[in-house]
Amino acid sequence: MEKISAAITAIGGYVPDDVLSNAMLEKMVETNDEWIYTRTGIRERRILKDPSKGTSFLAIEAAKDLLNKKGLDPKEIDLLILASATPDMPVALTGPYVASQIGATNAFAFDLQAACSSFLFGVSVAAKYIESGRYKKVLLVGADKMSSIIDYTDRATCILFGDGAGAALFEPNYEGLGVKDEILKSDGIGRNHLYIKAGGSLCPTTAQTVAEKQHFVFQDGKTVFKYAVTGMADVAEEVLKRNNLTNNDVQWLTPHQANKRIIDATAERMGLPAEKVMLNIHKYGNTTSATIILALNDYEQQLKKGDNIVLAAFGGGFTWGAIYLKWAYDGAQVKK
């Protein structure tokens, strides 16, 4: 029997219309455009302002974009995985709701949470289902409404995050294209440095936790930056060595868009010039589970069949990793 690889055969994306620029943040907290941009690489981010819409709305729009571009009947989807750090509710999975709303009536669905590494870990999980031979079409959606868990009086976090979603369809491939290798890691020390304190079983919601703003993201920025710079760069470099790839063999690095300095450090360790690095953090900020797939979506027209691509991410937990894949189609042939 031929070896089955899991290849991405279609992608889609969605960001809300409302823009939150650095200039607008200057009026909200003590900061300025130059300070934000030089430290993060971010100029603006998108915000889903409608309080009646959650992460599921973003996910549904991204999935619909993929279905329209691919011309795919949603009933053909076998499994939908929603990668997200901001589900609609703590209980009642968001993935099954997204599946029902897009008409994927034959799919089962579940949520996956690994903070900013959610989509990367989701690629690994989606690939395993395809490689099993039992599933033909797996839809992975990375989506987050980060604005719902951000304190817009906290300069340390409100400048970083935005809302958005992206989707990727995985199908079997017999040409050696698709996911080739992965290095995924985690370290529980991370829970001390990047977290939402309240709202879980350890610290249930009370009037006091709400009053003390314990339901917003807290980040020890310096510590997280230190771990992220080394973690992402280490695994990206390791996945190249393990597959006997040089920097000349790699067409694209698709990094998690958390901070341009982290991205630059990872590219430098891999020996990659800026023109081989996908970058859209200036437009969207850190969309958490959506960054990698939104970058692929933005660069889709430039992707060629057979391109060697390295995906890399670092997130809370801590969680981090790198995935090496061979791209399965010519993006220039896709109708936007």
Functional labels for PLM-detected ranges:
Residues 29-38, 89-103, 139-146, 201-209, ...:
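Acidic-glycine-rich active-site phosphate/pyrophosphate-binding loop
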Residues 56, 60-63, 67, 86-87, ...:
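Claisen-condensing/thiolase-fold acyl-transfer catalytic domains that form or cleave C-C bonds
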Residues 42-46, 76-81, 100-113, 148-153, ...:
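Glycine/charged-rich beta-loop-alpha catalytic/anionic-binding loops adjacent to active sites
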Residues 131-165:
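Flexible, glycine-rich active-site loops centered on histidine and acidic residues
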